[in-house]
């Protein structure tokens, strides 16, 4: 089963409120190890710090929920900025506003109440953009099994790189 959850203006949503939201949205679905969770962000990020914070919270809270259901190998992907909408083909799509539903191919649609930002969470920062700040970036490491941490690292590297991203395996 392929499930999409769209967030608009993610802001300072805390990990606890996100974990509860994932439980609320996914609790009635028959997920298994082959299921895929696609978290779709409509926000435009200008600072790598804000993107890193959002990715960390989303991967942590969604993985916490899946682990609580013994779904250790369920895939999680956070989609930001440019991605192919046609490749999604979702069984379920959860959106904060019905108007987002027409953008994606889905079998089932559900509108949910997105929690408000939590003022006690670390606030997103302002400052000069570091999007595509470096022409070339290089990463080394072992990427033989891509896990959530690797996805965050690769996303951040792609965010700050404008021309060439070199990844050693």
Predicted regions and their residues:
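Nucleotidyltransferase catalytic core that binds NTPs
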Residues: 1-169
């Amino acid at each position: 089963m392929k499930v999409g959850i769209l967030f608009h203006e993610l802001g300072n949503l805390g990990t606890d409120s996100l974990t509860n939201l994932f439980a609320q949205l996914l609790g009635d679905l028959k997920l298994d190890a082959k299921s895929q969770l696609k978290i779709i962000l409509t926000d435009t990020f200008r600072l790598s710090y804000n993107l890193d914070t959002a990715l960390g919270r989303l991967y942590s809270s969604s993985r916490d929920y899946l682990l609580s259901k013994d779904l250790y190998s369920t895939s999680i992907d956070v989609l930001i900025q440019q991605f192919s909408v046609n490749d999604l083909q979702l069984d379920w799509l959860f959106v904060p506003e019905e108007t987002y539903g027409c953008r994606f191919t889905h079998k089932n649609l559900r509108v949910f109440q997105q929690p408000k930002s939590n003022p006690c969470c670390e606030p997103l920062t302002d400052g000069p953009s570091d999007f595509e700040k470096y022409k070339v970036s290089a990463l080394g490491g072992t990427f033989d099994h891509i896990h959530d941490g690797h996805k965050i690292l690769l996303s951040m590297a792609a965010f700050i790189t404008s021309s060439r991203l070199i990844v050693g395996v």
